[in-house]
Amino acid sequence: MKKNRVVVVQCRLSSQRFPEKAIKKLGNKTVLEWVLNSMHKVPADRYFVATDEKSYPVINEICIKNDFECFSGSLEDVLKRFCDLLQNVDAKTVIRATADNPFLFYEAAIDSVEEFEKRNKGKNRCDYLTFTGLPHGSGVEIFSKEALLKAATETKEPYDHEHVGPALYNHRDKYICDFIPSPNRYNFPTLRTTIDTYSDYLRAISIVNYCKAQDEPYTTEQILEAFNSKNVKNPVVLVPSVIKGHGTGHLHRCLNAAINKTFFVFIPYDKTLEEADSIINDYFKMGLHENQIISQLPDETYNPIIVTDTFKLTKEQINQIGVNKFLVSLDEGSDFSEYCDYLVDIIPSFDLQRNPNVFDSSFIQLPKNIKNKNEKSKSIDSIKKILVCFGGEDPSGFTIPTVNVIEKVFPSAQIVAIMSNSQNLSINYAAGINVEFVKSIQNLREKLFEYDLVITHYGLTAFEAAYAGCGVILLPTTKLHKNLAKKYNFSYIETETPSVTSVLNAFNSKNFYPNLPINTESKSLSDFVDTLSNAKKILCPICGKKSEQPDYIISRNSTRTYRRCQICGMSYMSFSLEEDKIYKKEYFFEDYKKQYGKTYQEDFESIKQQGFRRINNIKSLCKIENKNVFDIGCAYGPFLSAISDSKAIPYGTDIAEDAVKYVRNELHYPACCTAFPEINITEQFGVSHFDVITMWYVIEHFTNLDSVLRKVNASLKKDGVFAFSTPSGEGISAKSNKDNFYLISPTDHYSVWEPSKAKSILKKYGFEVVKVVSTGHHPERFPCIKNSAKEISKKSLKWKIVEKYSKLFNLGDTVEFYCVKKRNCEN
C-alpha cells in the first residue's frame, strides 16, 4: 500500500574533518551500509541516497547492493540537491538521515514519522518534526516535501542551503516546526553515535566489537547496552615501540594482548621498524582485526587508556600520548616514568631509580613445551642443535659474527640463525653445510625446546629459552645488558664481540642452565590490562588541575598510586583500581569489626568519650552552650550525643541510611541522609549558618575537597570553628615506612593530610588553624620496638620513653585540626 513517504540519506565523501567516512569499514560493512540497513526498517515507498557527482560512482555501487536508488546533485548546495531529487518523486513525507550515523534509532524514526503524519491529519498541519534528546547521531528529521520545496525558493541563507532542515525551522514565522522531547526509551542526549572525526570512528568500531557484526541493524537497546560496556566507555590503546633498533618484542607483546581482547594498537605512519608490517600481517592471520590497528590516537572526545610498551618513552611520545584517561607503561626505562599513572614491570630490570606498581614475571608467556631434564648436558658433543637469535632486527649485526665463532666451538652442531629482514638471506656463507639462515620461526616460543643451546641477548627469548630447559648464553649488546645478565644469573659472553675463548667460558659457566627468579605461574597480560581499564585517575582534591608537568610520585602499590600536588602540596591518591565503597550497614558492623574487633555501635561509648575530649578543645576556642553544631559524617551519632550532653544543639548528616535512621529514631537528633557538599542546610534544618562544623575521619573520603571546604566556609558563621580529624602523613607509620603506610591506607582515603602543609591549604579557604592535636600514638610502630628481638612490655621504660617521644614530636598516626573562620572564601 502506498505510503506517500520517501527516505533520503544525505551523503558525500569530501568531508574535511574525516574524508570518505561513509565508506570506512565498520565490522563487515561500510558506515553507509549500516545507515541504509537501518533506514530500510522505516516503511516508505522509495529509498534514496542523495550525493554529489564526484561521489556518485562509489556511492552508487553501495546503493545497488543495498536496494537504494542513488541521486547526484550539487556538492555545496545540499538544499538544492534535495529539492532537485524531490521534484521527481511522488511523496508527501520526507524522512532525512545522514550517512555518518551508523547507529540510528530506527524505532525512533518510525515513531517520529507516524507522529508527523498524525499531526498532518485533517486540517492540522506540521511542516517539520524531529525528536529531541536522542544521542547525537541517532535521530532523523521528518518534513513535508511541499513545504521544503517552497522554503527553498524563499531563502538565500548559506546555512539553510548547506543543512536542509534550517530552511524550515529557521523560519518559524512561515512554517510549523515541532521539536518533540523523545520518549524515555530514546532519551540519552549525552551520548554520541555520529561519525564526524577519527575518534568517533574508533568509538563506532568499539560498539561493533561489543555488539558483534550482524545482518540486521542494532536495536536501540543493543546500542545503549554497548555504550554501557567497558569496550566503549574505556577504550584501550596499546602503543608498542616500532622504532628501528628496539627489536620486535614490544610489538609482539602488544599484538598478542590485543588479539585476545578488542584493544587498539597504535602504529604510526612514520614507523621505522622494517619488520612491523609483516609481523602485523601474521597476527591478522591469527584473528586480529584490521580495525584494531590505528594510525592516529583518539582525541579527548573519546579519551583512551594508553598502555605503552616502548622500552623508553621520549618527550615527543609523552606529548603525543598526552590526551588519555590514564597512562599505563610496561617495563618503562626512561626518566619520564612520573608521567605514568601505573607501572608494570614484567622483565626483571637492573637498578631502576623508581618502584613499579606491580612487578610480576608471570606475565611472561612461558613455553608449554619443555625439555626433559635428562636431556640437559654440558659436553661439547652433546650440543646437537643451536639457535642464534638477536631479535627480529639484530640492530648491532651480531648474527653472522656469532655464527662464525659458534661453528668453530661446536663443529658438529646444526646451527639455525634468525636474521633480520634487512639482511640478505642468500648470503654465500663460507661454512655452509651446518648453518641455516631463516627470516623468522613461527611460534618460536613453543619450538625453543628443540634446541640444546640458545644464544640471544637479554629479553623475553632468554627467559623463555631458560624455562624451556635450553642452555642459554647471552651476548650483551650494552653495559646495561651485561649488568642484567650478571644480576639474573645468565651465562654471558664477556667480550664485546664473540670469540672462541669467550664462548667456551660462557659454555662452561655454572649459569649455562640459569636458575631464574621468575614466577612460573602464567598470567594473561591482556586480562590484566582489561582489569586496569576499570581504574580511575584522580586529580588533586584541592586544586583539581592537571599540570603540564606531572605531580611528584610519593608511592605506588598494586592498586593505587599516590602523588604530591606541586601547587598546594597536598598528598593524594592519583590512581585507583579499587571499586568505590558503599557506606551501608555492613560498613559499621562487619567491616568495622574486622578492623577494630567490635562493631561501631559496640564502640559507641568509647567514641563518645573521644567526643567529649574534642569538645573541650572546641570550647577553648568558642562557647558552645546553646550553639548549633553540625557533624558531617555523623554515623550512628556518638559525637552528636556528646554535643547534646554538653548543652549544645546537634545536627548531623551521613550518606548511610541505616545510621541516619538510628540517629533520628533512637537518639532523636535532627539528621539527614544527604551527601555533603550537595546538602541544602536551610531546607534540611531551617538553619542558615552553624557555629561549629565537625568532620571526624571524614575529610579524607572526599575526592573534591575544594567544593567541600568552600561549602564548610559558606555554612559557618564568622569566627565559627571548623574541627576535623584524619590520618596523618607525618606520623611514625608514614615516616618509618612510607610505602607500607600508603599500602595499608584505606582504599577510600583520597587525601593524606600533613600538619606542616595543612595551615597554608586551609588559609586559602578562609580558615586559621589555631590548634593541632597529634593523636593515635603507637610505640609498637616505632622500629626500635617493632624490630626488637624480644617483646617490649607496655610497662617498660623503653615503651614509656618512646611514647613520650612520639607525643613530644607529634608522631601520632592521626591528627586533629581546630580552625577558626576568619573570612569568607574567595571565588
Residue ranges of each PLM-predicted region?
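Short phosphate-binding loop-to-helix
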Residues: 53-117, 292-299, 312-313
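A nucleotide-sugar donor-handling region in carbohydrate enzymes
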Residues: 214, 219-221, 340-397
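Short, glycine-/aromatic-enriched active-site segment of Class I SAM-dependent methyltransferases
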Residues: 147, 724-751, 756-761, 777, ...
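Conserved catalytic-core segment of nucleotide-activated headgroup transferases in glycan assembly
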Residues: 249-253, 375-423
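A C-terminal cap/extension of S-adenosyl-L-methionine-dependent methyltransferases
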Residues: 551, 771-827
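Conserved core of the sugar-phosphate nucleotidyltransferase
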Residues: 61, 104-193, 199-210, 224-229
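Conserved N-terminal segment of class I S-adenosyl-L-methionine
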Residues: 534-688, 692-696, 706-709, 774, ...
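A short glycine-rich, Lys/Arg-flanked "PGG" loop and its adjoining helix->strand segment in the class I
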Residues: 706-721
